[in-house]
């Protein structure tokens, strides 16, 4: 009714050289596949962490395309931004960027447990929980691998680092104070809230849901 074409597409279906995108638009009988021109506005629904996707975003922006969602800045930058808000900072668990494993040891002197989270991760992948037994000094850790819970222990930080190298790899990580998590029927849950600006430029809650862990 507005004389505009809306279509969905994968970032891998964009041909910049030809100025064509293979995508799908919704018609009276369902989804229709077709070739479309480079649009004026794109609302990205994917997480553009990979180098190829970031390059595609930059190329589209260089053509004058408006992308409504900026790329995610990562957990560490997000934490620093939230810490600048005096109304929020008291609600944030202590968080440090892991420059070396001694940072984890320092955190465990103050708290019963910590979480290690990849700076550029999502959907709970490669997150590690670490605790330290006060009496023995033994470190215990848990993480998910291919839908299976891996549990282990280490006698010192050097052995802990060696044990976690498989899951952590060369990724940048933050270490965060363990907090008490909400549970439903034994599963951890968290609440996701979608906030968008309305037609007047004011922020409005447009969606809310609970994510239940496995």
Residue ranges and their predicted role:
Residues 3-103:
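Conserved N-proximal alpha/beta basic substrate-recognition cap immediately N-terminal to
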Residues 28-31, 63-67, 89-91, 117-120, ...:
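Short, surface-exposed linear patches
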Residues 33-41, 58-64, 118, 149-150, ...:
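Short, mixed-charge, low-aromatic patches
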Residues 108-113, 120-128, 132-214:
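Phosphate-binding site of ATP-dependent enzymes
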